[in-house]
Amino acid sequence: MRRILAGALAAAVVVACAEKQRVGKAPDAAAGADASPSQDKAGSAAGMASADGGTQPSAANAPKGAPGMSSADAARSGTELSGPAASGTATSGMAASGTATSGMAASAHPPAAATAAPTVTRTAGGVGLLALPVNDKAIVNLELRFRSGAVDDPAGKAGLTYLAARMMLKGGTKALDSKALLNALFPLAAVLDVRVDKELTTFVARVHKDNLEKLLPILRDVVLSPRWDPAEFKRLREEAVNDVEKRLRQGDDENLGKESLWSLLYTNHPYGRLTLGHVTDLKSMSIEDVRAQAARVFTADRLVVGLAGGYPAQLGEQLAQAFSALPQKSAAEGPVAQAHPRGPRFLLVEKITDSTAISLGMPWALSHKDPDFAAMTIARSAFGEHRQFNGRLMQRLREARGLNYGDYAYIEHFEQDGGDAATAQTGRARHQQEFSIWLRPVQNENRLFALRAALRELQRSVKDEAFTEEEVGQTKGFLDGYLLLFDQTDSRRLGYALDDAFYGMNGFIGTLRAQIHEVSTEQVNAAWRKWVDPARMQVVMVGPDMAEVKKAILAGTPSPMHYQKDAQGNASPKPKALTDVDDVVQALPLGAQGDADVSVVPVEKMFE
């Protein structure tokens, strides 16, 4: 009954949130820690009322890019993958503030039929074009999606693609220096961003159609005629170094844990290096390195121009022709290799903190195109939906025990889209993915108990406690409404269409909505057992006294649950059924295979 009520409440919250947006009220601010890993605070932003069919995220609060490996061929064919895709949205110009969106009725709507999305056509100049049908909205959305990213970084130059993209966006053009560029954007109330990920770099432009003709020359110059000013290079390189040294290491324990997990999962793989760059690599880069990288990876044959909203009929062809002035061809792209981690199972990052951030996961090849994706979506939601209470992790770790603020699971790389939206960013499509669990920070005395509790829930979900008919039915009802929020805006519809093109498929969201209704409980459990292997989960913890934690892990020392106490030092009584489970959890074997399987690293060494 509790699960049904929790699911109903979650679905009601989704509906209420959509209705609140429909009548034009501003959304509540999201908790900062839920925003995607490296958020770019440097971009300037001003309010813009969006007619994009939904609330647009603030450019200044959008997340950043990604870096990672040796030359283009080697990068995509090389070793293993993982990564710090966390950081990747550099922003310039104005951010949207949000306006009305259409309402949503949860389960009352029939499932959306799978609809064929537009396909990419190659123009004479080699540039791809993907245009959603023109509508009567006042906002025009443009995306320049390059099949280039952190995997294209040469060895010893982690962060080069990200820095090149930031130089293009924020370093000025031949016609406008950086200050003049900002001044030109301000009165247009436009968004101009870039997001760098492992395999993709996306320049995003969004503007009212009345200002489109003023924005287009700026966008063209940003991509075709960067200024490459040595002073701007020095400034932006220093920003990137500070982002790693100060923001990530010192001020963002949760995303430090996530980034560290991705580097662990993709040991010796092009995904395994921080997209933002490693400090020593960044400091070694020259402006000549950046210019050469831009010419090598931002080429016409790797570009798809995406359009959505109320754009002029000839805009796509005009942009494709303009951007055919890019270098025509780059080195052929090789396939991204499968990820096979060779690192320790436990990475313990030593840092003086009041609580411990925990992330755990394993790499796999599950993608949107896989026949199991709908079943895995249901299982993942039932196990730990992002920022919702209808999953086992939230009910049993937070609700029953009060361990922390939230506990979530993901079946693909996830970075939140910003604002109060709990949806994932688009533009993060990859040939390799990962399963991960994110435990929000816990009290240091409870960190090993929390880890054991999460691992026990995962083990039981694939063996002793399969998802029930009730859980699957309730989760389907929740997703029936929740998935309607995923593509409410033109910008998100365009993002998904471009992601579909990456995977070689059409209509992912519509197909997923339809398939959710067809999957049986048996199929959900079979897919979950097929893909999830608790023994392969690797663990990152960020907190103090990690040498002692290592000893406890290797010795198998029990870690009892410490419940919160009142002012008199008394803990509220707990049901015997719960404390009996606690007794089992505290002694759960963690599976360390010896000293080399547990690595302790000072925070100053991470991404150095």
Range-by-range predicted roles:
Residues 143-206, 272-276, 387-416:
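M16/MPP (pitrilysin/insulinase) zinc-metallopeptidase core fold and M16-derived inactive scaffolds
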Residues 14-16:
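C-terminal motif of bacterial Sec signal peptides marking the signal peptidase cleavage site
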Residues 172, 215, 247-299, 322, ...:
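Scaffold signal of the M16-like zinc-metallopeptidase fold and its non-catalytic homologs
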Residues 126, 144, 162-164, 185, ...:
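Buried hydrophobic packing residues in well-ordered domains
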Residues 18-20:
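Bacterial signal peptide processing site
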Residues 267, 299-300, 304-366, 385, ...:
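An aromatic/glycine/proline-enriched structural segment found at the starts
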Residues 52, 181-293, 338-343, 452-456, ...:
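Acidic/histidine-enriched segments that form metal/cofactor-coordinating
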Residues 22-94, 98, 102-112:
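Post-signal peptide N-terminal segment of mature Sec-exported envelope proteins
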